[in-house]
Amino acid sequence: MHKKVLLAILDGYGISNAIYGNAVQNANTPMLDELINSYPCVLLDASGEAVGLPMGQIGNSEVGHLNIGAGRVVYTGLSLINQHIKDRSFFANKAFLKTIEHVEKNHSKIHLIGLFSNGGVHSHNEHLLALIELFSKHAKVVLHLFGDGRDVAPCSLKQDLEKLMIFLKNYPNVVIGTIGGRYYGMDRDQRWDREMIAYKALLGVSKNKFNDPIGYIETQYQNQITDEFIYPAINANLNSDQFALNNNDGVIFFNFRPDRARQMSHLIFNSNYYNYQPELKRKENLFFVTMMNYEGIVPSEFAFPPQTIKNSLGEVIANNNLKQLRIAETEKYAHVTFFFDGGFEVNLSNETKTLIPSLKVATYDLAPEMSCKAITDALLEKLNNFDFTVLNFANPDMVGHTGNYQACIKALEALDVQIKRIVDFCKANQITMFLTADHGNAEVMIDNNNNPVTKHTINPVPFVCTDKNVNFNQTGILANIAPTILEYLNLSKPKEMTAKSLLKNNN
């Protein structure tokens, strides 16, 4: 009987020896504890240069799944754009130059839309500053900024805005048109009611207005509203023609990570909402540029076209005529499909994709169990039918992002119950489970000043195998996972997979 493998990815489950504020250490999780302490386990580096990011940069779900699936270190987004800025090729980018040509021809504006954050997960402020430097020489530039509060401290927007306002003193033709939290402008779970509020602000319509952007943020803070949840507001000092999206304008969506940029991009460029809401009619003759490939969105140009990841783990499995399953809830479905397959939406032979709906709650600390039981129920019905399965549990990451320590404890304890069900099933059916994570989060929920922490970490993640005959090398990175699984399955590793297997005495 040939081997069957389940790769379970616990999103945001990092390892730290610290006790205080560490939901991973302090939750009652007997099954996970047993796996890490009593089965073959190695810690993997999931941040910085180990995953193709700048040194010291926190890992994230997109990069984590890319590296796991690719079997090589993948340089994307942040590192790629940083290098283009450093060597100045950024300022000669064809997509940007075409945008300038378009707005000069049409005497129109350029809108820079995206997450205003130094987190480096979806975007980076240095990229925005470079765009301002480039475009302000040629046209009026309008900024539409989404507050973060998840990948950085919950109330860091004010400080970043203060720095931006100083920077903008040298660029008088650049204005801040709108400000709002990513909760509204960067949804990825089809919550169109939220996204529509942010979109209408881009069109010049909002119940909230500001004369001073920093003053508006301060008022939000006074009302206990952190950066992520700031209600979209428009600049009261400008008429709508001066800042709102209009016909013939140029648009740059400067997020390099696609998953939370797709819905807003759809509203701007592809929306058919105007069929029953005429005021939302898509603007004509927009020149719309996305920093990277936003799957499902066809812009005028990509600033940085997608690189091809040839012979990913899923592709190798398919080429060997093996059946594979991908399963996750909505929040992480793109990660076990699009990102795991190298940043492309592909349909492989003998592949089944199963999407479990995420719960419709405002924030996941209100339902910390999320959809882990429903995922497990569906998984155990199907698992025996597949040679290779990729599973993602979102709880540690999504509840970790709320900064609610007690909710994260509950999330991990609910998850542990489902992990035990899976382990028991795998043992009974001769299926080997490899368990890992894409980055850390839940292991640092409170800082030394007793403040909640909502962002990812640079801590390592576990890589566990339920086959006790396995011996791992002592250290590794996420890219080692795919070669390890291929060797375990007795499948040849393609030359494109430059990382090595972690199985001892083998390459």
Curated annotation (Swiss-Prot):
GO biological process entries: carbohydrate metabolic process; glucose catabolic process; glycolytic process
Cellular component, GO annotation: cytosol
Entry keyword Methyltransferase: no
Pfam families membership: iPGM_N, Metalloenzyme
KO phenotype (gene knockout): Probably essential, it was not disrupted in a global transposon mutagenesis study.
Alphabetized UniProt keyword annotations: Glycolysis, Isomerase, Manganese, Metal-binding
CC cofactor: Mn(2+)
Residues where Mn(2+) 2 binds: 11, 61, 438-439
Swiss-Prot/TrEMBL catalytic activity: (2R)-2-phosphoglycerate = (2R)-3-phosphoglycerate
Superkingdom field: Bacteria
Quaternary context: Monomer.
Recorded family membership: Belongs to the BPG-independent phosphoglycerate mutase family.
Protein name, per record: 2,3-bisphosphoglycerate-independent phosphoglycerate mutase
Gene label: gpmI
